[in-house]
């Protein structure tokens, strides 16, 4: 059985390069420290997801991501759209700086970012104080888990713990929009 982690133990696991599962707005997510290449590569290996696809990161505020994203490069109206949508279930592709790691952005010239209002995600990001990878807790191509009970036992056996809680009310994972163009990339 995979350990249930309180916030302090979740932060300790993340600090040590661990991969954890936690509920998000619609589905269960897997997370790790995106600043640690080995942690991200382990998470991608668990999911069988190619690094070229990149990952979403969640954070307690956009300020936590200033080294990686250049929100000021957006037109004022677009920047306002992004900032007024947070915290909330909105994932935006933001322009990156040259310090954004390729193991996080993949082959893209932007970074997918969400400042979540989901209570578990918000509490975890607040306790962690840094960006956190947020990708669905499933193998690539498989349906995402909507409950802890639906998490694949084989996947659970490969991670370092679970932060308990309930998913939010969204029926689908969050919409992804390009902040530069406003284009919807995932609906």
Swiss-Prot record:
Required for the formation of a threonylcarbamoyl group on adenosine at position 37 (t(6)A37) in tRNAs that read codons beginning with adenine. Catalyzes the conversion of L-threonine, HCO(3)(-)/CO(2) and ATP to give threonylcarbamoyl-AMP (TC-AMP) as the acyladenylate intermediate, with the release of diphosphate. It is found in: Cytoplasm. Belongs to the SUA5 family. TsaC subfamily. HAMAP family: TsaC (MF_01852). It catalyses: L-threonine + hydrogencarbonate + ATP = L-threonylcarbamoyladenylate + diphosphate + H2O. The keyword tRNA processing applies. One of its GO terms (biological process) is regulation of translational fidelity. Keywords: ATP-binding, Cytoplasm, Nucleotide-binding, Nucleotidyltransferase, Transferase, tRNA processing. The keyword Nucleotide-binding applies. Residues 4-187 form the YrdC-like domain. GO terms for cellular component: cytoplasm. Its EC number is 2.7.7.87. It holds the Pfam family Sua5_yciO_yrdC. This is Threonylcarbamoyl-AMP synthase. GO terms for molecular function: ATP binding; double-stranded RNA binding; L-threonylcarbamoyladenylate synthase; tRNA binding.
